[in-house]
C-alpha cells in the first residue's frame, strides 16, 4: 500500500469540494513531492444539506441520511496532510492486518498529470496488423471508418483507418438530370462527392433495377440530402443506416473473427479447411440448392473458429454523497470520487482511495490479493484510474454508460482536465474510451432475448445484486451505513466486490457470457459496443442487411413491404399491443398434480418459417404465381423461390439441432470445445426463437404483419392437431402454452406414439423438456409452481418479483416455497397444507404485531422524473418524496425513495420520517394476499378458508 501525491500547485492551498471548479479553471500544473508533504491549509467546509431535528433514535438505517442539527459542520472532505514518518510499515498481505499502518507518500518517481494525459490521448494507430476485429467506428476528424482490432501479439487494442476509399451514400431512383429538373441538384452541397449508377436486385419486384448512388463525404449529409430528394417526390433507399454499419455490410466484415489488415486489404482467416466444411455441410444440407450449401460452408467456418482470449478489466467507482439515497448527478459531478476498484482477468485487484480526514482503517483484514493506493489528489487518482483501464482492450462496467464513465469524465473537467484531452468519449446513448472498448453489463443483461433464451429468466431485476445472485450464487457486500460513512476497510471490501462481480458475470463458466457476445457479433455482423447495447431486433436487422449486400440485393423500403400486407389479417388480435393473434394457451386446472411431463416442440416457429418458406418477400407477393395458402389467415406464400428469412433461420436451426446441440454434449471432445459449442447453439437459439417476433414488431425495419400472422396461425394449427391426437391416445393434457404440453403421468409407449405422430404429420420434433414430480396450478393462465424431479423450483407468474416489493414479503414467500418443495406424493398434501397455513398465519400475526422492522416494511422505488413534473395521478413514492422536499431536501430523477404505507390521510411516509407506529398493517395485508393467494388456490381453498385469517383481517383493519 502506498500514498500517491497530487499535482496541485503549492500556492493552491484550497482543497475543499467548493474550490474544484475554480481550481479546474487554472489548468494543469505540477508540484513537487515536498509541496505535497507540506500539506494543504485547513480546508473550507462544504455546504451541509438541509437538516432535520431528531429527538429519538432512528428506527431505520435510512434515517441516518438526515443529519442532526447539532450546530457542528460535517467532516470536511480535504486532502490529507502527510507528515514525514521515520517508520514505514508495509501492508502484510499474509496476515491482512492493517493496524498500525503508517500512510506516507512514496518517494518513487511518478508520472505528472500532464504525462498521464498525453499517454491517455495517444492513439494506437497501425498500418498493418493481424488481430481480432471487435468493432468499427467513424472518425469525423479523418472522415473515415476505423477498425478496432485486438492484437494478440501485443495484448492491446489497435486502430486501423480505412484505406479502401469507402464513403457514405444513399440510393434513389432519380437520375442526376431528374434532380436538377426538380430543383434539388444535390451536387451543389458542400458534402457532395459524386453520382454513381448502380444495379441492384429488387427482392420484391424480382428484377434488376438501376439506381443512382449519391456519394457524400459526411454521414450527416445523408440525412440532409435524403430529405431533399424524397421531398421532391423521388424514392430513396438505404438512407437510414448508420455509416459504420454500412461499412461493415459493404466490406462484408465479420466482427469477432481474426483478420489480416494492411494497405487496402482486409482479409479474414478462418481455421476450418474448406474440404472439411464441405463434407459436414453436404451431410446436413444435402437436399438444399448448391448456392445454399456454399453459404452454409462459410457459416460453418465462422462457427468453428475459436473465440479470442482478451485481457479484460472491470471497474466500479464510489462517490461521496451527503444524502445516502441520492445518486450524484453525473452531468454536474458535484462530489468527489472517494474510491475506485478494478479487477482483471489475470486475477489482479486494485483499489484507489481518496484521502479524507477522519476516515481511517479499522481492525481486520483487507480482501486477499488487493493492491491499495491512497491519493491526496482526486484528479491524479482519476487520471491514473483511466490510464490503468485504457491499458486493456476491453473495459467492463455495470451501469457505466449512465453513471461511472459520465461521472468520471465530468469530474475530470471540474478538476481542470480540458475536455479535448478527456480519455472518455460520451456518445449520444453510451460512453466509451479513446483507446479501449466498453461493455456495460446493465444494458447487456437487459436485452430481453438473452434474459429469456440464454439465461432462462433466472433474474428479474436488472441490478448487480439480483443478476449476480441468480447466475453466480453470490451478491454485493451488505452495508449497515451509507457508502460515504464507511471506514476504509469496509469501503474497499464493498467497492472491490462490485468490480469482481462485474468481471465474473462476463467470465464465469469458462468465459460463457463473453464467448456468447463473440458468437452474437459473428452472427449479427455488428461490433461489440453495438450488440451489447441493442435488442435482438437490431441483431437480426444487421444480419439481414449484411446478407442483402452479399447477394447484391436492394434493401426494400418499409413502404414497399407494407404494400404486401394489403391482404389483411383474417383473425383479430387477442394480445394487447399486437395487431395479430398469438399462440394458443389452454385454460389450466386448479389443483396439484404429480408426475407431469412437459413436452416442447423443438424450435416450433423457426421450423415453420423454414417449412413454409416464410419471409417478407415471399408472403402475398404479387410477382409470384406458384403459391400456397396459410390456413386460418389466408395469406399466400410463394413456392417459386426461397425467401431470405427462410434460408437464414432454417440454416441456423439445422446447424443447432443437427450439429451443435450434439457437439455440446459429445464427451469425446475436450471440455473447452464442448463449452464453446454450447455457446454456439445457445446463440443460435436466441436468434431463431426471436426471428418470428421481430417481423411482428413495427419498430423492425423489415416489419411484415403477414409473416408474423402466418407463423402464429401455423403454430396454432400444429397445437390443435396434437391435442386432438392426444385425446385419441387417451393422454391427459393438463395444460398447454404456445409450444409446450403438460401431460399428466403418461404411459411411455403411448407418449412415443404421440412423438412419432408429430414427426410424421408436421415434420417437427417433440422433446421432453422437464419432469415435475409435483406441480401446483391456480387456474390462471401462465401461473404455476412446479418442483422438478431434481428438486428445482419453477415459478411462473405466482409472485410479483419487482424491486418495489417489501422485503419481508420476499423473505416469507421464499419460506413458503421451501415448504412446498417437500411435496413428494399425494399423501404429503395434507401435512404441507397445514404447515403452509401455519406459516401464513404467522406472517399475518407478524404484520399485525409489527414484528418486522421499518426497513422490512419499506418499499423502494426510484424517481423516473423530478417530483415537480408530476401534475396529476401522483404515485405514492412521489408523495413521500414531496414530504422530504418540504424539509428542504432536493430530490430529482434517479433518487431512490424508501417509504412505508401509513394510516394518515396521505397514506405514505418516507422512512426517514416514519415510525413503526405509523405503519398501517391493513394495507400490507394486500401485499401478503397477493403473494400467497394463488398458491392457496392450488389447494382448492379460498383465502378466507384458512383458519384464523378472516378474524385476523378484521382485527387488522379495525385496530
UniProtKB/Swiss-Prot annotation:
InterPro entries attached here? DNA-dir_DNA_pol_B (IPR006172), DNA-dir_DNA_pol_B_CS (IPR017964), DNA-dir_DNA_pol_B_exonuc (IPR006133), DNA-dir_DNA_pol_B_multi_dom (IPR006134), DNA/RNA_pol_sf (IPR043502), DNA_pol_B_thumb (IPR042087), DNA_pol_palm_dom_sf (IPR023211), DNA_pol_type-B (IPR050240)
UniProt KW keywords? DNA replication, DNA-binding, DNA-directed DNA polymerase, Nucleotidyltransferase, Transferase
Q: Where is the composition biased (Basic and acidic residues)?
A: 44-60
Q: Does the keyword Transferase apply?
A: yes
Tell me yes or no: is Nucleotidyltransferase among this UniProt entry's keywords.
yes
GO MF terms, alphabetically ordered: DNA binding; DNA-directed DNA polymerase activity; nucleotide binding
Per the UniProt entry, what are the Gene Ontology biological process annotations, in alphabetical order? Answer: DNA-templated DNA replication
Q: Which Pfam families match?
A: DNA_pol_B (PF00136), DNA_pol_B_exo1 (PF03104)
Question: What EC number is given for this enzyme?
Answer: 2.7.7.7
Tell me the enzyme class: transferase
Q: What reaction is this protein's catalytic activity? A: DNA(n) + a 2'-deoxyribonucleoside 5'-triphosphate = DNA(n+1) + diphosphate
Q: Which domain of life is it from?
A: Archaea
Q: Where is this region: Disordered?
A: 1-110
Concerning PANTHER family, the annotation shows: DNA POLYMERASE 1 (PTHR10322:SF20), DNA POLYMERASE CATALYTIC SUBUNIT (PTHR10322)
Q: Which family does it belong to?
A: Belongs to the DNA polymerase type-B family.
The name of this protein is DNA polymerase 1
Q: Which gene encodes it?
A: polA
